[in-house]
Regions:
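P-loop/Walker A NTP-binding region and its immediately flanking N-terminal helices
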Residues: 1-135, 161-163
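Non-catalytic interfacial helical region
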Residues: 9-16, 20-23, 27, 98-229
Length: 230
């Protein structure tokens, strides 16, 4: 148990190369996008630690890398680490992507953060003609930042996509929710076990997991952090 704790290195959602358990949702989003009916403001709602951010980053990579070398693989739902957009996203430097979240010194997403998103939307695009905004932990919006965000959402065009991540144990303002198309992400117990096994395989080279207790301790550690490190 102690060895697991000491050697554990959590892979951030934006750096996860493999996507497990979201194949149905991913294929559904692809069909909507190819038919030009993918909602521009998508609310991903589900339990904390269920992989919503990882799913969002994978689909964002699919969109941004579509015409690039080493593009996203829809055959096995993996990101190529040599892909240009993946590298930019990992460094938070992709010109067509903006992350809106609370900063380290505050539990709230501030109005100034939303203003920065607006500035991003007013800039020209590069590499592709779409822009993407990921709003992590939307429940951290306060009244002022929510009002500012509403104005941004009202001006969204068909080349801009918002992925809004919501921990469904927390409440969000109805005014924000009403601007989104909500996708409630849910997994059965058997699906969760399958996902867990795949995640553990991903870490097998880091350390050896021998007992069931260690497996579940491992699972709790990698899914318990609500903040996404930069």
């Amino acid at each position: 148990m102690n060895n697991v704790s000491e050697n554990l290195t959590v892979i951030l959602p934006k750096k996860q190369l493999h996507l497990f358990g979201y194949e149905y949702y991913f294929n559904s989003f692809i069909k909507l996008y190819q038919k030009y009916i993918l909602p521009n403001v998508i609310l991903l709602s589900g339990p904390n630690g269920s992989g919503k951010a990882t799913f969002a980053y994978h689909f964002i990579n699919y969109l941004l890398s579509y015409n690039e070398k080493d593009k996203y693989s829809v055959n096995d739902f993996t990101i190529n680490p040599e892909n240009k957009s993946y590298k930019y996203l990992c460094d938070n430097t992709h010109p067509n992507f903006s992350l809106l979240e609370n900063d380290e010194l505050s539990e709230n997403i501030k109005k100034d953060n939303v203003r920065n998103t607006l500035k991003f939307l007013n800039k020209s695009t590069y590499f592709s003609d779409i822009k993407i905004v990921l709003i992590d932990n939307v429940e951290y919006l306060n009244v002022h930042s929510s009002n500012a965000l509403l104005k941004v959402l009202e001006e969204t065009n068909n080349k801009t996509f918002f992925f809004v991540i919501h921990n469904n144990s927390c409440k969000i303002l109805n005014t924000i929710k009403s601007r989104c198309v909500e996708f409630k992400l849910f997994f059965t117990l058997s699906e969760k076990i399958k996902i867990l096994k795949n995640i553990i395989k991903q870490y097998k080279d880091n350390f050896k997991i021998e007992t069931i207790d260690e497996c579940f301790y491992f699972f709790l550690r990698i899914t318990s952090t609500s903040r996404r490190a930069p």
